[in-house]
């Protein structure tokens, strides 16, 4: 039973655990993760273990494969537990020690003579693995030390310095070992103070020879055993050492004659090699070449084993291991590169496939492990040193694997020079196998430079440099093992030169063609002849770069997409298990199980650049391989070719995992058809089949647990096949990032980064650029537009001021203004924008309240966006204009678009409707997409009642679906940003009421017929450019035009203008032919009425229409003589002109009375009267039936009459010279009051009194629904469709 005090201590800073024995080959106490967190333990922290005996102190590790049964269980090696007096199942109390002292010196003693002999024979192994087995020691402790997999010895801790109850072994701790011989006596052991052995730190070179025979102690070094075993004459003879020497001498004579010299010469090096090769390391393992140098290698001194010649470093996948202190094992092995699927495919194309390979075609690398039956080695194997970091972790990986084994056992880092020499690219796969044969000792070496040497370099300089290099690269405890030919770099004349080191003769002749390795050391070099050649050897130049460097920008160099980039990078990091938290929590959903990333955005929005920047960050930060598939380039190819390209990319990514696959512009090969008519086209069928194939590839990678992340780009999520974006089944894309059009702040960032990337300078340092002003003027621009804009600005600057270097180029705001002139952004290309007429608010008469509402709702927010952006409530963006026809609704929409400076898109209602299911809704979506792309934009729907009637009244259901789509677009979740919706109708009662609720078209503005004051304003506006006579009284005209709308007043002025034209051109027709009312030539009979009930209303076209007619009248006065025949055609047709020789019939055929452009349509001839001629000649064009050729008498008569008309016309209009001179309209051509009254007599209002009453009642009921007559008296017929909206 635990006492009360101990229970209290357990609750405050300790824990009670149950001891369980294991077969682990170390002295660490293994604790479950929950207990580690409970005790707040730190790395290398000591733990006090207390039970019924004296407390002991142990070091701890976390049990990675711990079997937690719900209680605190601490595992420890059986031999350690028994020596401490523990029993399996016994309960002990654990308490973390707050402070641990590092030991400077530790004195130990083997427990028996057998232990001493075993320790003496396995000194090298113990030096390399001692710290892997024990870290915390305390006096009088007896601990086991393992020298191999099955053998262990016991040592006792004698004393610690400084004298502390417990301490920690460090890499620089000196370890004094007292030898224990079989005939040892008490007086034969020296004191601890006289010992010379020490335990040196990692990376330190040996500085002196050992004197272990003199002191009877072992001199241990963490990097190797002593460099030689030289004897001292002062060493006393000992029977045990004599027996040792006799035994070694007998073994020498027992060997063959060829092995005697090898035993006496280089025996220590061969012995060390065999000891190192006896280490328990993974055999024939596959590793992935990593890019980043691990911190454990980067932080070590340059003299350590990590930086020796031909040394590779193996690490486990867990990157957390890089943060702990390095404990490594060094062995010798062979490294060979394995061909990837793409490289194997390239070799297959270059050579003819053998019959064996035809039977076994290339397989996908998604298998459990790599075997020699389906992999191909690239190049010859290279002999090198292998530094195993985290060996226990690597062993656990092979031992505790899941049902599906990983492709690679771990990572291997190869120095750049060695990697390039072996032609191994980044993220390649290599196989490391142990060196099975014993290395031989060379007799002769040859050194030859691979580059030109300075002239003053001699052979002695090369030999000196080689000797220095060999002393740094090899010691007796860690000899250098090389292949038959190596490339080394020697320091010659204060510079590094590359040499080729080759073995000319070896001590033993090769038997067969087996693998050959040679051992070198500074001691062996004394008896090896070195041949030096100063002439450089001829080598093949290989200028190709084996590493493919991604030429992409990083996320911090883009601008405007920082939040999107961070979010997308978080998804990729979790998918590739790039963080400790990801490895702990998301190991079951790694790779594509976490879903793919979809980046969407419009054309030129930068989605491909963002995706490539994410790939660049993943390559740099996560050491991921990147495979890019340009789907746009695959469009139009055969299905088999596209599928093969995708399979190669996926296989390559699986081979080099962790990897990132980028499918750029995926909608080009796996997208939906643009129009419903193409749903069953061959392209659509192929796109659907490719989507199925892509889905199958992803499922296969998910099933084998590949560490692959997938990124795809598309214009929108709806553009892809439903199989890839369906909400049912497996979600392919679980992270969707949409790039919105940039706001002003984002445009500043984009512009700043584009200039910085192109010019290499920071734009903030230039005070000549006003970024805020340029960003405000580039509304609607996307990333690609800014790239083109900067190019145009640079071109503008260079054309103005040439520079010689890029640093001298300094852009200014004026350069950007010149670049913006005439530049159309990509978002506005292929967008049907309707340019409003050049009219302002001053060109509108009346409608003051309506104008003010439009200004407050649309114009002011467009001019002051920052002010309105701070409003807490969402501002109004939809307005419905309703009123009788001709009251100026269309005119208001155009004027507000021009005054606000926004883009203008006008939609006629019926043009959105289609007979195909879904086409009408798609047309509505496309319209709003166009408006979003062109924002700030005004979207104007004319004849709105035709596309948005009440639901339930359409037998086909087309308009019902259109209304539903409009409701979604007007008041969706995202809302409209920068798009204002205007709708015009004369029948608001027919519109679905759901569209008129707040948040949609929430403001209904009534455009009433003009009263007398408004009519006077309209007449003043319309007649501003007309030549009015002094007797014109517009006030009187406004009073006598009751019920006239703006369109009617426009028609009135048209007719008055034509009356003035008749009096100007044909004044005799009003007097010679009788009264004007009886004359058929009177142009007053051509009245212009506005009977349309649609949107060509009001002065929207009136002002410009009058201006155009005035221009035609002005031109009639200044026409040249050739154009005067248009008047003759008014009466005689074009055939007479041909007869007079004024043009061929082909040239004048377009001017015949039947042609649309004929002037006779505007001024029709009067067939019944002939006031200007004494005779009535009837002539027809040659194309008309009944044509007769004119006689000479008829021609003479016509010429005489034409001359009379010409003389009368010239006398009225003045000299011919004045006709060719442009000038203002003459005062003789003026619209008088009589012309207005004559036109009024033939002009009637477009809306009758009865229709006006109906409209008034209709609008009254619409504005006040509660005042409707008999609101509940409606009788429904059986089968009638109604709506509850």
Swiss-Prot record:
A Pfam family of this chain: AAA
EC code(s) of this entry: 3.6.4.-
Phosphoserine: modified positions: 354, 1183, 1211, 1213
Keyword hit for Aminoacyl-tRNA synthetase: no
Primary location recorded for the protein, binned into one broad class: cytoplasm
Gene Ontology terms, MF aspect: ATP binding; ATP hydrolysis activity; protein transporter activity; ubiquitin-modified protein reader activity
Catalytic activity as recorded in UniProt: ATP + H2O = ADP + phosphate + H(+)
Region named Disordered: 344-373, 1142-1162, 1262-1285
Domain of life: Eukaryota
Keyword Oxidoreductase among record annotations: no
A single cellular component GO annotation: peroxisomal membrane
Function, as annotated: Component of the PEX1-PEX6 AAA ATPase complex, a protein dislocase complex that mediates the ATP-dependent extraction of the PEX5 receptor from peroxisomal membranes, an essential step for PEX5 recycling. Specifically recognizes PEX5 monoubiquitinated at 'Cys-11', and pulls it out of the peroxisome lumen through the PEX2-PEX10-PEX12 retrotranslocation channel. Extraction by the PEX1-PEX6 AAA ATPase complex is accompanied by unfolding of the TPR repeats and release of bound cargo from PEX5.
Protein name according to UniProt: Peroxisomal ATPase PEX1
Organism: Cricetulus griseus
Name of the encoding gene: PEX1
């Amino acid at each position: 039973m635990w006492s009360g005090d101990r229970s209290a201590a357990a609750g405050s800073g300790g824990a009670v655990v149950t001891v369980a024995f294991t077969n682990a080959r170390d002295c660490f106490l293994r604790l479950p993760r929950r207990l580690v967190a409970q005790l707040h333990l730190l790395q290398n922290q000591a733990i006090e273990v207390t039970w019924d005996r004296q407390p002991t102190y142990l070091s701890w590790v976390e049990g990675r494969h711990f079997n937690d049964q719900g209680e605190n269980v601490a595992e420890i090696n059986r031999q350690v537990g028994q020596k401490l007096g523990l029993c399996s199942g016994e309960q002990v109390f654990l308490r973390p020690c707050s402070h641990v002292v590092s030991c400077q010196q530790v004195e130990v003693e083997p427990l028996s003579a057998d232990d001493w002999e075993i320790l003496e024979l396995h000194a090298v192994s113990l030096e390399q693995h001692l710290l892997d087995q024990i870290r915390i020691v305390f006096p009088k402790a007896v601990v086991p030390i393992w020298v191999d997999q099955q053998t262990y010895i016991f040592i006792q801790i004698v004393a610690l310095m400084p004298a502390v109850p417990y301490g920690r072994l460090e890499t620089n701790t000196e370890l004094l070992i007292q030898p224990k011989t079989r005939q040892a006596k008490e007086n034969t052991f020296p004191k601890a103070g006289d010992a010379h052995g020490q335990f040196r730190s990692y990376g330190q070179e040996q500085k002196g020879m050992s004197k272990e025979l003199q002191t009877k102690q072992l001199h241990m070094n963490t990097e190797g055993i002593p460099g030689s075993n030289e004897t001292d004459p002062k060493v006393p003879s000992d029977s045990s050492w004599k027996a040792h020497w006799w035994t070694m001498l007998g073994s020498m004579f027992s060997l063959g004659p060829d092995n005697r010299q090898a035993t006496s010469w280089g025996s220590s090096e061969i012995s060390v090699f065999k000891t190192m090769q006896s280490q328990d390391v993974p055999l024939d393992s596959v590793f992935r070449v990593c890019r980043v140098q691990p911190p454990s290698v980067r932080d070590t001194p340059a003299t350590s084993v990590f930086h020796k010649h031909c040394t590779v470093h193996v690490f486990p996948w867990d990157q957390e291991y890089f943060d702990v202190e390095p404990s490594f094992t060094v062995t010798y092995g062979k490294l060979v590169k394995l061909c990837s699927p793409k490289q194997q495919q390239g070799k297959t194309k270059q050579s003819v496939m053998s019959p064996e390979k035809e039977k076994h075609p290339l397989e996908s690398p998604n298998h459990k492990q790599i075997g020699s039956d389906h992999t191909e080695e690239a190049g010859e194997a290279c002999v090198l040193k292998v530094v195993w970091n985290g060996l226990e972790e690597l062993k656990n990986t092979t031992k505790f694997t899941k049902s599906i084994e990983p492709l690679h056992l771990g990572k291997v880092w190869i120095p750049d020079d060695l990697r390039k020499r072996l032609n191994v690219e980044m993220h390649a796969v290599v196989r490391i196998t142990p060196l099975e044969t014993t290395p031989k000792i060379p007799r002769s070496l040859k050194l030859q430079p691979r580059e030109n040497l300075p002239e003053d370099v001699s052979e002695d300089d090369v030999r000196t440099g080689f000797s220095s290099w060999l002393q740094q690269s090899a010691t007796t405890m860690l000899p250098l093992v090389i292949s038959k030919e190596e490339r080394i770099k020697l320091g010659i004349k204060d510079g590094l030169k590359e040499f080729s080191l080759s073995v000319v003769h070896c001590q033993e002749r090769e038997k067969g063609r087996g693998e050959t390795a040679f051992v070198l050391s500074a001691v062996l070099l004394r008896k090896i002849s070195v041949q030096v050649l100063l002439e450089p050897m001829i080598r093949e130049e290989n200028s190709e770069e084996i590493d493919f460097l991604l030429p992409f920008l990083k996320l911090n160099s883009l601008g405007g997409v920082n939040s999107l980039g961070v979010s997308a990078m978080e998804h990729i990091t979790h998918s590739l298990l790039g963080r400790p938290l990801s490895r702990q929590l998301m190991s079951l959903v790694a790779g594509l199980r976490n879903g793919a990333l979809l980046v969407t955005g419009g054309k030129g929005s930068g989605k491909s650049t963002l995706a490539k920047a994410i790939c660049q960050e993943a390559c740099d930060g996560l050491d991921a391989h990147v495979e890019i598939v340009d789907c746009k380039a695959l469009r139009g190819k055969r299905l088999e070719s596209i599928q093969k390209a995708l399979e190669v990319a996926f296989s390559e990514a699986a081979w080099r995992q962790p990897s990132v696959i980028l499918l750029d512009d995926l909608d080009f090969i796996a997208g939906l058809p643009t129009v419903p008519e193409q749903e069953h086209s061959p392209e659509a069928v192929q796109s659907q089949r490719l989507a199925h194939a892509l889905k199958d590839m992803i499922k296969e990678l998910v099933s084998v647990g590949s560490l692959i992340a997938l990124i795809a780009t598309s214009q929108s999520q709806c553009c892809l096949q439903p199989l890839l974006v369906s909400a049912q089944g497996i979600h392919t894309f679980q992270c969707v990032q949409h790039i919105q059009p940039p706001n002003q702040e984002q445009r500043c960032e984009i512009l700043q980064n584009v200039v910085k990337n192109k010019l290499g300078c920071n734009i903030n340092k230039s005070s000549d650029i006003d970024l805020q002003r340029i960003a405000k003027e580039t509304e609607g621009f996307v990333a690609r537009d800014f790239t083109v804009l900067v190019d145009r600005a640079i071109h503008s600057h260079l054309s103005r001021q040439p520079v010689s270097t890029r640093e001298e180029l300094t852009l200014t705001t004026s350069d950007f203004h010149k670049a913006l002139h005439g530049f159309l952004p990509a978002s506005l290309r292929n967008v049907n924008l309707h340019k409003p007429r050049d009219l302002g608010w001053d060109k509108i008469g009346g409608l003051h309240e309506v104008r003010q509402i439009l200004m407050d709702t649309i114009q002011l927010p467009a001019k002051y966006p920052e002010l309105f952006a701070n409003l807490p409530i969402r501002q109004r963006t939809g307005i419905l204009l309703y009123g009788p026809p001709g009251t100026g609704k269309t005119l208001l929409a155009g004027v507000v678009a021009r005054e606000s400076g926004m883009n203008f898109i006008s939609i006629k209602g019926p043009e959105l409707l289609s007979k195909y299911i879904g086409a009408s809704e798609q047309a509505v979506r496309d319209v709003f997409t166009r408006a979003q792309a062109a924002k700030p934009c005004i979207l104007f729907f004319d004849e709105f009642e035709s596309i948005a009637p009440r639901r339930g009244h359409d037998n086909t259901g087309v308009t019902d679906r259109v209304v539903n789509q409009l409701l979604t677009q007007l008041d969706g979740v995202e809302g409209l940003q920068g798009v204002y919706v205007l709708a015009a109708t004369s029948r608001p009662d027919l519109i679905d009421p759901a569209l008129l609720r707040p948040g949609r078209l929430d403001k209904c503005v009534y455009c009433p017929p003009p009263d007398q004051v408004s009519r006077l304003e309209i007449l003043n506006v319309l007649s501003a450019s007309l030549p009015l006579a002094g007797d014109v009284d517009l006030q009187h005209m406004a009073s006598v035009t009751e019920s006239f709308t703006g369109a009617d007043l426009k028609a009135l002025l048209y007719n008055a203008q034509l009356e003035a034209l008749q009096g100007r051109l044909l004044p005799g027709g009003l007097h010679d032919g009788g009264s004007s009312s009886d004359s058929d030539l009177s142009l007053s009979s051509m009245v212009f009425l506005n009977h349309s009930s649609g949107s060509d209303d009001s002065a929207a076209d009136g002002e410009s229409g009058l201006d155009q007619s005035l221009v035609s009248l002005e031109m009639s006065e200044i026409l040249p003589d050739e154009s005067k025949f248009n008047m003759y055609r008014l009466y005689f047709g074009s055939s007479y002109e041909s007869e007079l020789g004024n043009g061929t019939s082909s040239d004048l055929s377009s001017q015949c009375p039947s042609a649309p452009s004929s002037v006779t349509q505007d001024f029709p001839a009067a067939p019944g009267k002939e006031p200007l001629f004494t005779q009535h000649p009837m002539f027809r064009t040659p194309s008309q039936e009944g044509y007769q050729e004119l006689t000479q008498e008829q021609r003479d008569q016509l010429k005489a009459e034409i001359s009379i008309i010409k003389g009368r016309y010239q006398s009225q209009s003045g000299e011919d010279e004045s006709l060719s001179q442009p000038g203002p309209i003459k005062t003789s051509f003026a619209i008088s009051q009589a012309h207005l009254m004559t036109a009024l007599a033939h002009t009637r209002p477009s809306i009758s009194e009865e229709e006006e009453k109906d409209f008034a009642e209709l609008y009254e009921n619409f504005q006040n629904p509660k005042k409707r007559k008999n609101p509940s008296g409606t009788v429904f017929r059986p089968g009638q469709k109604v709506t509850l909206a």
